[in-house]
């Protein structure tokens, strides 16, 4: 069994090691109203990292269903305390799209399958959604105490597997920086805007994101929005999955 978190605790922002990575902060603009939109489902094969309805996200006022989050909500993050959601989006995938595009099938993570009784309930994620893994093996094998691993690279047995679905809605949200948030008891990522992930959006949707985050229109701006942790490849992740 892969144990995603040996410590199994929520780290307080005051004790976070904020010096280990100096992430540039995008200055908040005035466009903080909710932006909920249906995204392009089939522009590129890579799947945008997303949650699914029913996932509970830890916020400043307790757990909130991800589908109820709106821009302006305050969410608990691992590194930077409680942060404000700047953007939310959704991608609806019906059964026809799912049938002809198996790479879009959600990954089911069974309750307790990741060690320490985590996640707290059955959790479904998009294949590319990255989960935080922090245990002795990550430190020994990769010289990193904490790493991110795509859900599709955690597949093993019946506990973590790709499932057939008649359709789903993929939901995601974004902060001023890439954050790690608490979802059904496990730490996983917020939306990370990269060249690849932004290709999953139509022109109008990208324009709305760029209105909130104008720096992301340039390659340098996207590069400055760095990932919160190192991401393991499929081969690297296989070393952690029994």
Segments (PLM) and residue ranges:
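Sequence-level preference for short, compositionally simple segments enriched
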Residues: 1-51, 59, 64, 163-242
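Long beta-strand-rich cores associated with HINT superfamily self-processing modules
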Residues: 52-59, 76-205
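Structural motif
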Residues: 67-74
